[in-house]
Structures are given as structure tokens and as C-alpha cells.
Amino acid sequence: MSDTWLNKVNWSADGLVPVVTQDAISNKVLMVAWMNPEALRLTAQTGEAHYWSRSRKKLWHKGEESGHVQKVKEIRLDCDEDVLLLVVEQVGGVACHTGRHHCFFKKLEQDQWLVTEPVIKNPEEIYGQR
């Protein structure tokens, strides 16, 4: 596969694009992350999500430590060509490093952020003590 399709993406000045990751079954948004061209290429080639970690400044294969990989069903590019959507099968049901199904587990109620989603698996069981 030629890489010309990568040039259609409007990468930011720092060479990144935001990625919304959605569960293929529930349609819930699981997480938002970032990709550089190499992460997108690897995702397309392997069928599993790869992202760019801005804090660690390195490629990150989702599930490399936890086993909770994301099997990619679709890769979509938005109308402005500057945001990606990954539709995935979330292996193990846990997408968030907090041990929850998705990262959007805090909901604004009145003037407080309330935790609305349970922990599915204790992060220490997933990653060990850090």
C-alpha cells in the first residue's frame, strides 16, 4: 500500500492529529488520543490501534502492557481532514488506564464532576504497581 493516503490528513504543525476512538458495538466514545503518520500507518497495516504519546514522546500500541488491544474495524477522516475516528472492538472491555470501559466517566452535575462509571478491573491488576 502506498503512503499517499497519509498526505490527505491535515496534520497539525507538530505532526499530530486527534483521534476519537469509538466502540463498534455500543457506539460509545472510548477515548481521545493522538496519532502521528507512523502511528496511523501501523494502525492501518496491523489492524490494531497505535497512538502517539505526547507525554512519553513515543509510539504506543494500545494494549501493549494491559492486553486490552483495540481491533480496528474502520478508520474514518472527518470533513476537514484534521480529526480521525477509529471504530474498534475493545478487547477485554477496558479502554481507560483507570480500569474503566471508557475515559469519559466523569459527568458534570450542578457544579461537581461525578464519577458515573464503575472500575471494571483494578489498574494495579492490569499494570502492576507503578
Curated annotation (Swiss-Prot):
Binds 1 Mg(2+) ion per subunit. GO terms for cellular component: cytoplasm. This is Phosphoribosyl-AMP cyclohydrolase. NCBIfam families: PRK00051.1. Its EC number is 3.5.4.19. Its cofactor is Mg(2+); Zn(2+). It comes from Nitrosospira multiformis (strain ATCC 25196 / NCIMB 11849 / C 71). It is an enzyme of class 3 (hydrolase). Zn(2+) binds at residues 79, 96, 103. SUPFAM superfamilies: HisI-like. The gene is hisI. Mg(2+) binds at residues 78, 80, 82. Homodimer.
